Amino acid sequence: MSNQHAXMXSNLLPVGSNISTWWNFGSMLLACLMLQIMTGFFLAIHYTANISLAFSSVIHITRDVPYGWIMQNLHTISASLFFICIYTHIARGLYYGLYLNKEVWLSGTALLVTLMATAFFGYVLPWGQMSFWAATVITNLLTAIPYLGVTLTTWLWGGFSINDPTLTRFFALHFILPFIIISLSSVHIILLHSEGSNNPLGTNSDIDKIPFHPYHSYKDMLMITSMITLLLLILSFSPDLLNDPENFSKANPLVTPQHIKPEWYFLFAYGILRSIPNKLGGTLALLLSVMILTTTPFTHTSFTRSMMFRPLSQILFWTLIATFITITWTASKPVEPPFITISQTTSIFYFSFFILTPLLGWTENKMMMTNN
């Protein structure tokens, strides 16, 4: 009877035998989320959402609270690892055509937007110099909305400038949004398992499936262990690697930093925003840089799902990756030549990927039909 139970348990989740390491990032994201919620809870115990005390409370956590520096640095570094994993997860989806499972892809895009909002609110909380000015610049983009802009901005701020009510509501939102992320993640996973995982070939996996446990579960554990090892290495040897030096100074509304920029994981969107000299145009481009992902399920034209056998599409995909990295790099630089030109060129390349992919799909279809 025990053998029957073991066989039943191991066959509860049959998975395609050929899914690669790129399929491990979902479980790594779940590990990141759990780590963020645990460390965030301990930080919230000691944090004070008040503009006079917020910066001091973070200093108090790192200096006086036992193991507080570990909690604070784990929370910061694992946020960066979270975004590395999610960007890799999205890139895998684009490469292997996983967006054709529309419900999963659209729920994933909703997750990405929620995650970005959560990270933005979290970045404001320490009330450092860069936190304050990044919040001022980004929330001020709402004023670009015709007619309603100023009213919406005042409503979000809770006054006529970023002040105590703003910090309080940002803390409340930063605390509640991870629970919304958990709910959306559950929806994402349920929708995925109603149809099952895809595989690198883009073919139906039903003909060759193996139990998820132990084969893929051990592979997941290996990748999670590797990620945690990297996390602990950064924590031990270079905990401030990803922090902005400006954020070690308390927010001062009277002094503007020489170069205002958000965390590295938002730089691609910030670079696109900055490359357009018009405020409304830049805001729309910023929104579109993320929301354009929702168009991919509806613009797929190729006969084959995966890019594995489409060399022209592969060139386009790797151009997108290079473009993403270049925009991130230029957005971290001051607004001056040659960075303005590079930023504008790479922004055009970024959006071109989503326009050229369906056109290239048609071309590849014709090439295949000609060869046949």
From Swiss-Prot:
Amino acids binding a ubiquinone: 193
Transmembrane segments in this chain: where? 25-45, 69-90, 105-125, 170-190, 218-238, 280-300, 312-332, 339-358
- Sites binding heme b b562 sit at 75, 174
Mind telling me which CDD domains this protein's record contains?
cytochrome_b_C (cd00290), Cytochrome_b_N (cd00284)
Instruction: Give the location in the cell.
Output: Mitochondrion inner membrane
Alphabetical keyword list: Electron transport, Heme, Iron, Membrane, Metal-binding, Mitochondrion, Mitochondrion inner membrane, Respiratory chain, Transmembrane, Transmembrane helix, Transport, Ubiquinone
Cellular component GO terms, alphabetically?
mitochondrial inner membrane; respiratory chain complex III
User: Which Gene3D superfamilies does this chain map to?
Assistant: Cytochrome Bc1 Complex, Chain C
Query: Assembly state and interactors?
Result: The cytochrome bc1 complex contains 3 respiratory subunits (MT-CYB, CYC1 and UQCRFS1), 2 core proteins (UQCRC1 and UQCRC2) and probably 6 low-molecular weight proteins.
Give any extra note attached to this record: Heme 1 (or BL or b562) is low-potential and absorbs at about 562 nm, and heme 2 (or BH or b566) is high-potential and absorbs at about 566 nm.
Protein name as catalogued? Cytochrome b
Question: What's the name of its gene?
Answer: MT-CYB
